[in-house]
């Protein structure tokens, strides 16, 4: 089940991030183009979650997966029609490769540390766990007035919403919070590198 959660996270963020290519030109560098799709997709996943919530559509992980796959299939078809499906010119940036290595080391450190003890970190984690389980079961981030959830509506519920959607793909709230919190803390290193690269040209 944990493997399904990891596949869902990366496939859905990448698929949603690929949608940006329909509207703006992407980088010519292979790594930058593909890695930034994860970052953009993560932001779009949160935006889409809020939109679905406002429209009273359940926050079901299968909806996000289907939309992501539709984007990827559409992109594949359009690239095939334009004969630009595969490119042998990868243009690997060695600095980007180094950042990926740093990300891998940082992720390992955070994941290893998170699972070194069998408890959640502090009071915030326990409060978030209530909201995450609520989103996973009820498939909504709106709990209504006087709810016992400290990090759902009216508080911006992005964290609990994202983790609640992911938690639908496995049966361990503990693992979901430990693993994906470590991943979410580590992955911005990649996005910050490309952000800094643009602003230091």
Tell me the role of every PLM-derived stretch.
Residues 104-201:
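Active-site lumenal/periplasmic loops and adjacent helix-entry segments of GT-C-fold
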Residues 40-44, 67-70, 102-105, 125-130:
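Mid-membrane cores of alpha-helical transmembrane segments in multi-pass membrane proteins
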Residues 22, 47-50, 98-102, 126, ...:
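Generic detector of bulky aromatic hydrophobic side chains
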Residues 11, 35, 74-77, 100, ...:
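Generic intrinsically disordered, low-complexity segments enriched for polar/acidic and small residues
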Residues 89-110:
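Internal/C-terminal transmembrane anchor helices
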Residues 8, 30-32, 47, 101, ...:
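Hydrophobic alpha-helical context, especially transmembrane and signal-peptide helices
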Residues 1-92:
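Membrane-embedded, hydrophobic transmembrane alpha-helices
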Residues 18-25, 99-106, 132:
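Membrane-targeting and insertion segments and their boundary/processing signals
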């Amino acid at each position: 089940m944990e493997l399904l959660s990891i596949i869902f996270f990366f496939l859905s963020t990448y698929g949603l991030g690929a949608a940006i290519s329909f509207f703006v030109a992407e980088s010519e560098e292979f790594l930058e183009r593909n890695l930034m799709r994860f970052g953009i997709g993560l932001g779009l996943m949160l935006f889409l979650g809020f939109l679905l919530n406002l429209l009273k559509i359940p926050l079901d992980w299968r909806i996000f997966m289907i939309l992501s796959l539709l984007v990827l299939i559409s992109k594949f078809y359009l690239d095939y029609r334009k004969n630009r499906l595969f490119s042998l010119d990868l243009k690997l940036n060695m600095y980007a490769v180094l950042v990926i290595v740093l990300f891998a080391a940082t992720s390992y450190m955070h994941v290893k540390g998170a699972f070194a003890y069998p408890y959640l970190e502090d009071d915030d984690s326990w409060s978030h766990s209530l909201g995450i389980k609520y989103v996973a079961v009820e498939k909504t981030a709106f709990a209504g007035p006087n709810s016992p959830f400290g990090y759902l509506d009216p508080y911006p519920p992005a964290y609990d919403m994202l983790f609640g959607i992911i938690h639908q793909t496995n049966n361990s709230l503990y693992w979901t919070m430990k693993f994906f919190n470590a991943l979410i803390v580590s992955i911005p290193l990649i996005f910050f590198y490309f952000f800094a690269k643009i602003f230091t040209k």
